[in-house]
């Protein structure tokens, strides 16, 4: 909840999916529906402003530096830039931007964020089937930056700060410099570590996933880490 300029967390829930969404042959929509059903059975969401995030690999984040421009002309110039940067016809995407102004410099840097309407509708359909109607959609790396910017007061930081968020299918790298950020998503995530374990030990994906999760306490920790080493090398 908000109290003036302060924000506090009043409640939260962690609801793991019944199966990892990268499990081969899984019905992602059905597993997601089951998790959402569990959420609404535990939390009263009626009347709440619902915000959902999409992973970085499902959307686009592009950054561009613009020449000095009057504030009133910025939206039109950014739209022109968005058409150049987004690899889909502009009428097929939902997009927005954030302008970053650096003190003492006339140039403006903008972050352009977009997702195809097809992907938006796919997600809204799944949410709608369980009676949830999100009002706002954002990108998970943007959410992470906003949270860390607030929690760590990055606007007062002198040096850049790097955040690495390893997801199931991809990894987001967020470089924050004060109130400005740069985001890049790489197609390497937790599923690649699981696949490496499955290949090394000739076991099923599900068993490999369990081994990965229990690696720290397993008597085979050394062998498991050895199996994942090539993926760590690619990530670094």
Predicted segments, located by residue:
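Conserved phosphate/pyrophosphate-binding and hydrolysis machinery centered on Walker-type P-loop NTPases
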Residues: 67, 138, 187-190, 221-225, ...
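Flexible hinge/switch segments at interdomain interfaces of large molecular machines
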Residues: 9-13, 53-54, 97-99, 209-215
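Adenine-nucleotide phosphate-binding core of ATP-dependent small-molecule kinases
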Residues: 208-236
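Non-catalytic, solvent-exposed interaction/assembly segments
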Residues: 1-81, 121-124, 131-133, 159
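Gly/Thr-rich phosphate-binding beta-strand-loop-beta motif of the actin/hexokinase/Hsp70
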Residues: 1-16, 50-53, 151-193, 197
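Short, glycine- and charge-enriched coil/turn segments that flank and shape catalytic ligand pockets
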Residues: 3-6, 22-31, 100-108, 151-158, ...
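Small-residue helix-packing motif on alpha-helices
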Residues: 74, 203-211
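Active-site neighborhood for divalent-cation/phosphate handling
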Residues: 49, 53-152
């Amino acid at each position: 909840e908000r109290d003036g300029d302060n924000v506090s967390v009043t409640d939260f829930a962690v609801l793991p999916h019944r199966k990892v969404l990268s499990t081969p042959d899984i019905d992602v929509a059905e597993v997601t529906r089951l998790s959402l059903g569990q959420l609404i059975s535990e939390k009263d969401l009626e009347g709440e402003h619902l915000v959902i995030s999409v992973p970085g690999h499902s959307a686009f984040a592009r950054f561009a530096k613009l020449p000095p421009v009057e504030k009133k002309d910025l939206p039109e110039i950014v739209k022109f830039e968005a058409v150049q940067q987004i690899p889909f016809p502009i009428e097929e995407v939902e997009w927005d931007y954030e302008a970053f102004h650096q003190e003492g410099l006339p140039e403006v840097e903008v972050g352009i964020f977009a997702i195809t309407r097809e992907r938006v509708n796919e997600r809204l359909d799944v949410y709608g089937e369980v009676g949830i109607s999100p009002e706002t959609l954002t990108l998970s790396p943007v959410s992470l930056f906003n949270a860390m910017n607030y929690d760590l007061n990055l606007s007062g930081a002198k040096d850049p700060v790097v955040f690495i968020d390893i997801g199931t299918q991809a990894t987001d790298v967020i470089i924050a410099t004060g109130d400005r950020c740069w985001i890049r998503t790489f197609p390497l995530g937790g599923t690649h570590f699981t696949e490496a374990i499955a290949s090394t030990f000739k076991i099923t994906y599900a068993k490999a996933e369990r081994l990965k999760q229990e690696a720290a306490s397993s008597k085979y920790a050394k062998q498991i880490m050895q199996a994942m080493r090539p993926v760590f090398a690619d990530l670094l």
